[in-house]
Design a protein with these regions (language model features):
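Short N-terminal leader segment in a subset of presequences, especially plant chloroplast
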Residues: 9-13, 95
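Bacterial N-terminal signal peptides that target proteins for export
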Residues: 1-10
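Sec/Tat signal peptide C-region and signal peptidase I cleavage site
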Residues: 15-21
Length: 132
C-alpha cells in the first residue's frame, strides 16, 4: 500500500507543477542591435526607452515566466511598478496584446518594438535576441 501512496503523491506533485513553455525575447529582423538581459529588464521596468515594449496579456503564464526570468520580479510586482510610474507621469506602460501571434504582428509593424513569445512560435518574421 505504501508504494501506491508514494506513487500517487509523486503523480500529484508532477501534475501540480506548472508547465511553462520556453520564453524567448524577440525584435524586428531589421533591428541589428544586440540586447542584454539587463537592457531588456530596464525596458520592461520603465528605466529605458531604447525599445517599445510589447507585453502579453495580464495573468498569462508566459508573462509571469518572462518577468521572473528577465526582470527577477513577479508579473504583479512589475504591474505595481508600472502603476506607480503611470500615476507619477514618468512613463507609459508597455502595450498589452492577447497572444504570441499578436506580439509577432506588433514586432513586424515596428522596428523599435521588443516582445516575448513561446520559443515554439518563432518564425522568420521575428529575430530572437535572448533566450533567458
Amino acid at each position: 500500500m505504501k508504494p501506491f501512496i508514494n506513487a500517487a503523491l509523486a503523480a500529484l506533485v508532477l501534475a501540480a507543477a506548472p508547465a511553462f513553455a520556453e520564453v524567448v525575447v524577440i525584435v524586428n529582423p531589421a533591428n541589428g542591435d544586440a540586447v542584454s538581459k539587463d537592457q531588456i529588464a530596464n525596458v520592461y521596468l520603465g528605466k529605458s526607452t531604447a525599445f517599445t515594449p510589447i507585453d502579453q496579456s495580464d495573468g498569462s503564464a508566459i508573462r509571469g515566466e518572462f518577468y521572473k526570468k528577465v526582470a527577477d520580479k513577479d508579473a504583479s510586482q512589475a504591474k505595481a511598478l508600472w502603476s506607480k510610474l503611470v500615476f507619477t507621469g514618468k512613463a507609459t506602460p508597455p502595450k498589452e496584446v492577447g497572444s504570441s501571434a499578436d506580439v509577432k504582428k506588433a514586432i513586424a509593424a515596428n522596428p523599435k518594438a521588443i516582445g516575448y513569445i513561446e520559443k515554439s512560435a518563432v518564425d522568420a518574421t521575428v529575430k530572437v535576441v535572448l533566450t533567458p
